[in-house]
A protein has these predicted regions:
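Domain-level signal for Mg2+-assisted phosphodiester chemistry and nucleotide/NA-binding surfaces
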Residues: 1-85, 95-98, 125
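Nuclease catalytic cores that cleave nucleic-acid phosphodiester bonds
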Residues: 59-171
Length: 171
């Protein structure tokens, strides 16, 4: 794996949300753990420019706060997927391959190995970012660069408890 990065590179970041969430929950042993996108994305980009950021998420229940935050901070979006994110993410990566220099895939799923090989054959630099324990070795080896997600890249989310309002009793 080479680690040469050109400063003028344009980057697309494609996140398999369900895969990353399951990996982080498994590693942290907590369902309340969330990926800290605000620290991870700048770390992944370095001095490169972000062209696209898309968070693929299975299901219809998608946090509007996440979608809003991605849009405000990175002009990113959340794409709901019917089942797994594998196919929609692969299609989008293939579509973007002519528009970017580098594609960073946040997933350790070995299902992406053929996508990685295809993108590399098209001249795209492919980087994988995932939790080490849940990353397929073949995916890590095939990528041009591997970024491990560590406990520094997530946080425990505890929603603020709503205060119960008491009605004032009238005498």
């Amino acid at each position: 794996m080479t680690n040469t990065v050109l400063i003028s590179q344009t980057v697309a970041i494609l996140i398999d949300g369900n895969n990353i969430e399951r990996s982080i929950h498994s590693e942290s042993k907590s369902e309340k753990t969330m990926l800290n996108i605000d620290t991870l994305i700048p770390k992944l980009l370095g001095n490169r420019s972000l062209n696209r950021l898309i968070y693929f998420r299975e299901g219809l229940k998608i946090s509007s706060k996440l979608a809003e935050r991605l849009h405000q901070n990175y002009h990113g979006s959340v794409r709901p997927c019917h089942k797994s994110a594998d196919i929609p993410l692969s299609i989008k990566a293939t579509q973007l391959s002519a528009k970017v220099d580098t594609i960073i895939i946040l997933s350790g799923d070995s299902d992406y190995i053929e996508l990685v090989r295809h993108l590399k054959s098209e001249g795209v630099r492919v980087e994988i970012c995932a939790v080490k324990k849940t990353t397929a070795a073949i995916l890590e080896e095939e990528a041009d660069h591997y970024h491990p997600i560590t406990n520094e890249d997530w946080f425990d989310y505890s929603p603020a408890k709503k205060k119960r309002s008491r009605k004032k009793s009238e005498n």
